[in-house]
A protein has these predicted regions:
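Conserved phosphate-binding elements of NTP-dependent enzyme cores
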Residues: 1-191
Length: 191
């Protein structure tokens, strides 16, 4: 039995009526790629894409939820492949990342960016902080499916993260808290 397993067993044995589970969460990075984001990691992006694809303007253009994916699909910027930046390899130095000249860092093609969900494009939505997104989703009637899971992020002090922020930019502590939030939202346990 490892030290952390022994410590967890001691804690749950000492307070069995108050502690139901102990979870080990390390500080290892969540992703090494800029393609993963908090909204993707928490499994909330599919619902967001469905909301955009359900807009009358999207339906009239034949846009499906895949058009609102920056990882694949027909709606992402072709030049930067939906990352919003281009990588310049610097032989003996660290790679340099510059904003994509075609999409100007917005990740999507112009026809996709024209689709609005209560006044916000998909890019605008991904730029929202967690705190701002909680309010936005509650206002549009997505309290249960989107606001509540994000509320846990806010409770652990990550309300300042942007929904579309690459996970490889997070610190070890931020990664650790995001892992904890994912566990709590999957188990439905917030206490």
């Amino acid at each position: 039995m490892s030290n952390w397993q022994q410590a967890a067993a001691e804690i749950t044995n000492a307070l069995p009526h108050r502690i139901h589970e102990v979870v080990m969460v390390d500080q290892s990075p969540l992703a090494r790629t800029p393609r993963s984001t908090p909204i993707l990691y928490l499994g909330l992006y599919d619902r967001v894409r469905e909301l955009f694809a359900g807009r009358p303007e999207a339906l009239s253009q034949g846009l499906t939820a895949s058009a609102f994916s920056f990882n694949s699909g027909s709606g992402r910027c072709e030049r930067c492949s939906g990352t919003g930046f281009e990588k310049i390899e610097m032989q003996f130095l660290s790679d340099l990342y510059v904003r994509c000249a075609e999409c100007e860092g917005k990740r999507f093609q112009p026809h996709v960016l024209k689709i609005k969900l209560h006044g916000k494009s998909i890019h605008d939505l991904l730029e929202l902080t967690v705190h701002e997104a909680i309010e936005f989703f509650a206002e549009i009637g997505e309290l249960k499916t989107l606001s509540e899971p994000l509320d846990i992020l806010d409770e652990v002090g990550l309300g300042y993260l942007r929904l579309g922020q690459p996970l490889n930019t997070l610190s070890g502590g931020e990664s650790q808290r995001l892992k904890l939030v994912r566990h709590l939202s999957e188990t439905g346990n917030r206490s």
